[in-house]
Amino acid sequence: MRFSLLLLSLLIVPALNTAHGQTAQPDPTLRVTLESAYENWKAAMTTGDIKKWEATTAFSRQREIENRIISQRLPFPQTLFDDPMDSPQLGGLVSLGVLSNGFAATSTYFGRANFGNATGTEIPDNLLVLHFLKEDGIWKFDNLRLVRIGDDGEILLQIRNTDFSFLNGAEFQPAEQLPPIEQPVTTPDMIAEAWIDATGYEVKVYVNNRLTGTFSNLKITELVNGGVNKGQNLIRIESKPLPESSGGAPKVEVAIYAAADAESQANRVFHYRPAGTPEASVTHGFDVK
């Protein structure tokens, strides 16, 4: 029951979505500043320097990562620096452009981004998107995304022709607003995972008044922020039907599984599956032994 880290910074996007109303503007003058911010963050990760990591990482991301590690009953910051996945070097990648809205920015690259792949492993060409937030006038690294292009000949042709209009797609846009800062968590009695089926709905799940996540028209598992404790726990589920959806008949189902540690068997401690239309908001208590 161990959840991947890489700072919560690596998100793999399988396909391009060009339907997006672009609000950020190109700003090539930021490229050197952003690359310097990324290299400083990367150096902190390589050397295991927690002070430098705190100085180079957006604060909202710091808190999210620390909470995620502690929620798994793992030591912080040791677990952060033990992550086996490396952050890629920018050398050898082709810069495609920088987008900024003033408080958030992205810098996108094309090429064979190496995340510590074993020697001899073939690395395909992909798009690497670095995300940054501006705090107190200083750009801080937030996360990175790998956009897989596979054999998409159209994208490859656009890149060869220096047509980077696909950067208008949602995958390449900076954050539209600054993310909220989570409250810190303490080490829980048990690690917990939420299993969610939100087919045709937007579902928000709160466990012990902490947001586990917001899920729209998908089936997914997610680490419960703050875990669960022995004895009584509370869960709130908010469900909102989506105007258009695909993937089957609309339904909402939520289950919580808990385990003493990452190596232990997880047991279901809560299950919600309404027979009819789910209520807009329900709150239940559940006991963990």
Summary of predicted features, one role per range:
Residues M1-S95:
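Hydrophobic, helix-prone linear segments
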Residues T29-V32, E39-T46, A58-Q62, E66, ...:
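Beta-strand-rich recognition domains
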Residues L74-V129:
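Surface-exposed, charged secondary-structure patches
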Residues L211-N217:
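Short beta-strand segments within Ig-like beta-sandwich modules, predominantly Fibronectin type-III
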Residues T221:
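Phosphoinositide-binding peripheral membrane targeting modules
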Residues V224-V228:
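Short, flexible loop/turn segments at beta-strand junctions in immunoglobulin-like
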